[in-house]
Structure formats: C-alpha cells, structure tokens
Design a protein with these regions (language model features):
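Transmembrane helical cores of multi-pass secondary ion antiporters/exchangers
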Residues: 1-403
Length: 403
C-alpha cells in the first residue's frame, strides 16, 4: 500500500535535485544526464518501486512517453532560435541534414548488416533511428539564451539540426517497416512518405505558428484580455502535433516550424516568447528526469546483455567514428573554423528520439525478429553518448565560446 508513497518521495527528491543539478554540472564540468543516470541506477539498486523495465517496457508505453518528451523539446528548440539568421546561416544545419545524416545512415546500415548480421529492414530501421541528433539530451550544446536574436554558430547549428532532422528521419522508418512487411512500392513511398508528408508537416506548422503568433499579438489589444501565460506553448505543441498527424503530415516537423514561426514573428513581444520557452523547458526537464532515471534502472536490469560486447563495439564506433567523420564531411569547405567544425561534428548526441522511432516501428510491424537486439544496441548508443558527450561537451563548448 505504501509503494506509491515511496514512488512519490523518490520522484520528488529526484526532481528537487534537478533544480540545482544543471548549475552543479556546469561547475564540475560533467553533464547532468550522467548524474541522473547514476541516481536512477542507485534507485533501482535500492529497490525503489518504480515501473522499472524488465528489461523493456511495452512498446506502447515507450512510444507515448518518448513522443511527449520529443515534441516538447522540439517546441523549446524552435523558440530558442533567434530571428536574425540569414539563408547563409541556415546553410550549415542543412549541410548536416543533407550530407551528414545520409552518410550516417549509410555507415550504420553497413555496420549493422555486416557486423551485427542484421536483416535489411532491421539495418535500415536502426540506421534511421540513430541518424537524427536528439533534441532532448542535446540541450547543453544548444542555444542557452532564448532572449537573444543571434547566437554562436555551433549552438545555432546543433539546435537547428536537432529540430529539423527528427522529422526527416521518419520517411526511412517507414521504408524499413514497408520492406519488413513486403509492401514497398518505391515511387509511392517517395511521393507520399517523403515529399507529401514533409510538405504537409511544414505547411501545418507554418499556418498554426503564424496564426497563433497573430492572436498572441492582437488579442491583448482588446481591453480586458491579458497576455497569455507560458503554458500556451504546451497547448500549441500538442495541438500542432495532433493536427499535423491527423492531416497526414509529420508532427515533429510541424511543431518545430510552428515554434520558429512564432519566434520569427516581429510583433510578438519578446517577454512572451521567453515565458513560452521557459515553461516548455521546465516541462522538458521534468520529463527528462523521469526518463533518465528509468533508463538508468533498465541498464542494471539486463537491457545491455542482449547485444553483449557487439553492442558496445557498435556504440563506440558510432559515437567516436561515424558521427564525427560524417559531420566533418558535411561541413567540409563551409565557412566555419576548425574548432567549430570539430565541435559540431563530435556533439551529435543520441537519445530519446531513437527510442520513439523504434517503438513506433515495432508497433507497426511484428516482422522485426531482431527487435530486442535493436533495442539493446540503441541502449548502448544512448549510454555511450550520455557518458562520452557528458564528460567532453562542457569542455568543448567552453573552448568554442572562448574562440
């Protein structure tokens, strides 16, 4: 009977710690996801009765939780980006999307098929799920000053990349599912899952973002109607995502574009944008605490044992070789200096978004016989990313900001 009281106490203590954890991590130069991971492992070891995965949660649970965290973080990412960026500035994120992301997918596909001996659809699925950088765990390398109209190139590029690529990975998740179910018609996939759904997602995001921005700016002019509170950003997030998905678009893209449209609207008062961003950021942190604590417990509950040493080798190659090399090739001959190129290339953090894509695919098709191995490999990659990037990113960003 008292289990739920223990859960409340444990979550309360963990979220209370989160109030100071970012400041502490900045001081000791270790990213706070590492500290949360350790806390989660300790809570599991002590037997705190949370809903620990054994070693997996049901796909439906994983889908709903990761989906909520990702779309909230995408709204936050869009609201962070200042308005004083030219088409020239946006070339860097698009290089990462159009060059780095495909190169990453190709490398992961061959590593999965040749080293892990996975089937073609499983290799494509793993490649697509690991290709996007994570908008949630990558918060420390993204723009920190949401009130600024322009930030340094590294923060901007990583924030914009995380916002865009989460939607652009989806066509290849569809591709893996269609191949697994032997239903692939290449022309239909390209026209529908690639072109049409991306277009609809961007269009819905722009329409909702500009419309809501107009309302935020106009309604307070009517006597008796005050400026909206920060929680309106959460309302916009869920509304945009839901409408885009219902109208056959990619909701992730729609949410990010909606946030950008509001941020870019000159007439919307800056303080309102900051309130919206701050509320979303607090919600994101709360959900992030819960997710990492649970993930920390799952690591001790056997999720890594399934892929064994091969999963560890795969994760090491991915984090230390594939993303940095693909990232640097994508930025080749760009106008960034060497330190900026290295920082952007190395800081391709992976996380919760990958879990969403995998759980979504497994709910669409039961033909992925390597399901547990795929989850295990993804867990290795996320763990390696949290630890390696968590120990190095604070130092890298300090060096970048000095330059």
């Amino acid at each position: 009977m008292k289990d739920h009281i223990a859960v409340m106490a444990g979550l309360g203590a963990a979220t209370l710690i989160m109030a100071w954890l970012p400041s502490v991590s900045k001081k000791i130069k270790i990213s706070y996801p590492i500290l949360l991971l350790l806390i989660g492992a300790v809570l599991f070891y002590l037997g705190v009765p949370l809903l620990w995965p054994d070693p997996f949660w049901p796909d439906q649970w994983l889908l709903y939780i990761s989906e909520a965290i990702v779309i909230i973080s995408l709204m936050g990412a869009g609201l962070k980006i200042g308005k004083n960026y030219s088409i020239k500035d946006w070339k860097i994120p698009f290089r990462l999307i159009l060059i780095t992301m495909p190169l990453t997918m190709i490398a992961v596909y061959f590593l999965a098929s040749e080293f892990l001996l996975m089937s073609i659809p499983a290799s494509i699925l793993l490649a697509a799920a690991l290709a996007p950088t994570d908008p949630v765990l990558a918060a420390e390398v993204q723009i920190n000053d949401a009130s600024s109209d322009k930030n340094n190139a590294v923060e901007f590029s990583l924030t914009a990349e995380a916002g865009i690529n989460d939607g652009l990975a989806f066509p290849f998740i569809f591709l893996a599912v269609l191949i697994a179910d032997s239903k692939l018609e290449l022309s239909h996939w390209f026209l529908d899952k690639f072109l049409l759904k991306i277009f609809i997602g961007c269009l819905i995001g722009y329409i909702i973002g500009t419309s809501v921005g107009y309302l935020i700016e106009r309604l307070p002019r009517i006597r008796g109607i005050s400026n909206p509170h920060g929680f309106v950003s959460l309302s916009i997030t869920f509304m945009t995502y839901g409408i885009a998905e219902l109208l056959h678009g990619y909701g992730f893209l729609a949410v990010f574009i909606a946030a950008l449209s509001i941020r870019y609207r000159e007439e919307v008062e800056g303080s309102i944008k900051e309130k919206m961003h701050d509320f979303v950021e607090e919600m994101e942190k709360l959900l992030l605490v819960i997710w990492i604590l649970i993930f920390g417990g799952s690591l001790l509950n056997g999720i890594l044992n399934i892929a064994s040493w091969k999963g560890a080798v795969f994760a090491g190659i991915f984090v230390l070789v594939i993303r940095p090399v693909a990232g640097y090739l994508g930025l080749w001959k760009s106008n960034l200096n060497g330190i900026q190129k290295l920082a952007i290339s190395f800081c391709g953090i992976r996380g919760i978004g990958s879990i969403f894509y995998l759980s979504w695919a497994f709910l669409q098709s039961d033909r992925f016989v390597e399901k547990n191995i795929i989850y295990s490999v993804a867990a290795f990659v996320i763990l390696f990313s949290i630890v390696i990037h968590g120990l190095t990113v604070p130092w890298i960003m300090q060096r970048v900001n000095k330059d």
